[in-house]
Amino acid sequence: MFVRFVQLKVSTEYLKTLQGFYEKIVIPELQKISGCQYACLIQNGNSADEFVSMTFWDTKKEAEDYEKSGVYQSLINQTKPFLAESSEWKIKLSDDFELKYEPVTEEPVLKEYSVAAQSGDKPSDEQNPRMYVRIVSAKVKEGKMDDFKKLYADVVIPTLKNTKGCQYVYLTESMQEENQIISLTIWDSKEDAEQYEKSGRFAELTDKVKHTLSELFQWKMALEKETGKKAKTSEDLEVSRYSVVTGKSFH
């Protein structure tokens, strides 16, 4: 299985409009595409203007064929009126040699992942309006990817599947960044995901796999233990939380 994320930063005036566009335009188009199993629009819990279009595919080739077909670019072009303006400005010289300043639109960012382990099938077509997505991004130590995957399959997945409200679990490996993985979990509700974090289970699982994570992350953990103070590095575990706005299963 293959997962694609298209990250969008949307202008505040179009936050509600995007849902209708996704339901009426994006989902019907994706439903026609061979290999697309599931599509959903999720909204960042910390930044209401940040959305992700998350799609699941049978194979990498079918996802690539979709991108090459022109449909993907057409959908991206149709979203452009909704996108927020960047803090950057474009400077260009006009025909009469005057400098012009134009705002730059926040372009969509595509990220692709191959599913390395999973708890079961793709999300079902029964859309729970309270569904919640939790994404943990981590950097794995060089040469430790196989060990990490085994621990994830043998320890992490069973623990999460026995946790109240956790419906689906996926370990995915980045196709663009070496040794970069994300743990993707889909929950019945935000409350269930938060209770999992508060229970200490997330910290326990992190402790069980930490020896397979990057050397920089391990150094940070050792430093925190020694000093009793929090440290921050470029290879920390990054936890992102999203509410499901809308979605549909196609098979």
Model-derived segments and spans:
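Short helix C-cap/helix-to-loop transition motifs enriched in small/turn-promoting residues
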Residues: Y72-L75, E85
